[in-house]
Amino acid sequence: LRKNKNVNIRGIEISKEKVQICIAKGLTVIEGNAELDLKQFPKNSFDYVVLGQTLQAFINPEIVIKELLRVGKKAIVTIPNFGNWKVRLDLLFKGTMPITSSLPHEWYNTPNIHMCTIKDFVKFSDTMNFKIVKSLALINKNISNISKSNIFLKNLFGELGIFLIENK
């Protein structure tokens, strides 16, 4: 994006090692916690803000969403879907917390503290009063639209939810 579209990209990363990797690749990134450090950015600092598969790891996801939509005009949020059929079956039949490609950790070392499904995130948007502009589900490496008529199936088979959101 930076090279081909002349996009100004900046990031916040909590892991010191990942910050160093980003800097080595020529990316502008600061070490910090989005839950706390987004406050330092002025309102509407960015056109788009991206939060990739970390919402479930924050203590207060509602604060993070509010801050994303304060500093960015729009936000792209991706979540691992805990409503996926494989996750449900592991818990039901094995009686253990599932390990999948989008949920690769054991229960005791996972950063995930909030289990969220695609349907939960849609409901969350109503509760938090933000608008979902576009929603997609990743199913077997294919991306498809989520709608009211197919949300049951996307919630059941989707491995990842991808949402473009903005303030109402």
Model-identified regions with their sequence ranges:
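Alpha-helix C-terminal capping/helix-to-coil transition sites in glycosyltransferase folds
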Residues: N44-S45, V71
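Structural signature of beta-strand start/N-cap positions in the alpha/beta core
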Residues: N8, S45-D47
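S-adenosyl-L-methionine-dependent methyltransferase catalytic module, highlighting the catalytic core
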Residues: E62-E67, K74-N167
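Short conserved loop adjoining the S-adenosyl-L-methionine
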Residues: D37-K43
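A short SAM/SAH-binding and catalytic strip from SAM-dependent methyltransferases
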Residues: Y48-N60
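Short, conserved loop/helix-junction motifs that constitute active-site signature segments
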Residues: L1, L68-V71
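Class I SAM-dependent methyltransferase SAM/SAH-binding core
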Residues: L1-D37
